[in-house]
Structure formats: C-alpha cells, structure tokens
Amino acid sequence: MIQFFFKLNDTELNKQLRFEAFYYLQEFNFNPRLRKQKYMLVHTNNKERKDYLKNIYSNEKYIIKLNPNELEYRIENSKEQKIKSYDYFISHSSKDSKEVQELIRKENSLKKNIFCDWINDIDYLKRHLLCNATLRVLEERMKQSKALIFVKSENSLSSIWCKYELNFFYELQKPIFIIEKDSIINKDFELKTINDYWFIDSDYKESTLIFASKIYN
C-alpha cells in the first residue's frame, strides 16, 4: 500500500490525487518529495490525449462529502488518526497559500512533518462548515503538533482563525515561531521565536464562533 502511494506521488498527473498521496505518506512520517506540476511527464505521443491529460485531467477535482463532526469522530476512534504527529502546525491565511506551499516544501526538505488544514484535512475543515467540531478538530491537530509556525502577513494579522490558533497554542505552552510572508518570497526561511503576543484574548473561542456565524450564516 505504501509503495502504491509513493508511485502515485511520483507519477500521478492529477494535482489533487498527487497531493492526497503526498500528504498520506507524510502523515505516516515518510518524507516524499512534492513534485511541481511543470515537472510531471505525460507518457503519450497522441497530441489530443496529451493536451487532455496536461490541461484538463490534471486540474480535475472530486468532492468528498465529509464534515468536521465526522473527522472529530475519526480522530477520537481511529488508531490511524491518533498516531498522527506533526513537527509544525502552520497558522496562516488561505490568501497566502502560494507562499505557504513554498514553506511546506522547504520544511519537508528538512525532513519536517507539517500540518496545514486545507491540505491535510481537505474537505473536512471547509470554513462554511464551521461549528464547535471544527474548532475541536483544529485543537486536536495542534495538540498533535510539537510547535506552531505563524506566517505573518497583512492577511494573517487580520484573520480570526490565526488569532484562534495562536491563542490555543499559547495555552498549550508549546513553542511558537514566526516567519514573514515577504521572507518566504525572498527565499529566507529562518524561523524566529515569537516575542509579540498581540493576539492574546481570554474570550478568543467565543469571539471566533460569533464572528464566523455572522459571516457564514
């Protein structure tokens, strides 16, 4: 089974399937290489089929009808979910996804296991499914992480989600590191220990639920 996922990670043209294989392997503490789409080979001489595979099939997506309550149940009852552990939990704005992916590639190259919610728990943690279970799932993933990396940007500084994650991780008394979005763009991946606790809010959980309910309902 593991060999199958390594092969899928190395050769699959569909981006979503390749990412699924990559993060499945990562979750079990393997260190696969995340290949960029432009380096994937299309093994056919048929021009029409090559165009389809390269431009259409590679971007096709499927929808998994799952929700945070189901993932919470899996975490509580599945051995597979319980053995997951991460070196870093990435707290970030989804608007900075390009830079976050660069950071993940860098940390993976250093043999670090990364948790990023829109990748590892794809379809479970969609923000429009927000509920207490969503927050409990995030909390469990943070408990499974040794440290947190906050990707600082204008987007993340105004993110209610980042504030929630930072507050919860602070309560866990685990290391919190910070990296500027611009630093990632400039290929400077040095992590610095956070020394500005601007985010601390004793009512952060309630504030997050109230804010999100106004946005998504």
Region spans (language model):
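Alpha-solenoid HEAT/Armadillo-like helical repeat scaffolds in large eukaryotic proteins
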Residues: 4-12, 36-45
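Conserved hydrophobic register position within alpha-solenoid helical repeats
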Residues: 1, 18-21, 53
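An anion/phosphate-binding loop that grips the pyrophosphate of nucleotide cofactors and donors
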Residues: 145
